[in-house]
């Protein structure tokens, strides 16, 4: 059989169905290329998540494998654990994946593992077994109906997030063994839940202190070595925390690195555009546009940069120095429909200033500003 196969593979001349000869020469294939749907997911994630290319790559790879029908049978689409310091974008990447695939950032079945620090609390997930108090009175969280609730006509998959998995008890980890390995969960009433169409994400801050200790400024070529050390430190911390049976069922552990000044600068533009979209979707009917000057952005970066807290600290700075002042200007009647506001930094760089640059702008013009900002962010992310 093997000689015949070798002869078939080595043949340079083949015949088509109509008997004509066809020159069939070996061609080198490119396994690095992805399909259109996976490319669209990658483009969407890169426009929303900054500085975490490895994590984006892993999500896209798992999704591409699922689309091609090559996923391991009887297992979830992906079992990914995200490690790294707080504010580095672990949860945000999961939400962005849901936003890109299901058109809804809230389409994530989120399990806050801090609520399961004791073994008996697992009943909230799977329900109480027959004969126990509360059986059939409360609905389990992880039912098949709950798992499938965000399916769309074109995308039939679920996104499940076990947030801060290290805070859960061993009982939850043991319960997850069947989900991660066999894509099956048995509820208290003995019904089965199928996770074969689910992407399982786990986030953890375990090892964050050790990783942050490695991010101190260094000289020379230490940057590449530093990233390797950070990844190794995070994974070793996870191996010390979780059991080998649990670790062995995870497809990939991805370490998120701390965000630098360049990443925070790009995140600032994304978050400001989210504020613009919030204005356009406001229920009170007051529509206006705004822009932040380079000096204003630098002020926000100065106030919002904290290596320990990552992007969350920057978001708090935007809420404090942009959103809350805009809210006061709206409430006091100083901002009207169609106004365009410029946000600049004061002469002493101690506060932001707000000035009306235009008024009476049509809604489509203000919407265009938000769309252009989003497009520029996506283009910049693609180039980077």
Model-predicted segments: where are they?
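AAA+ P-loop NTPase nucleotide-binding core of proteostasis motors
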Residues: 1-384
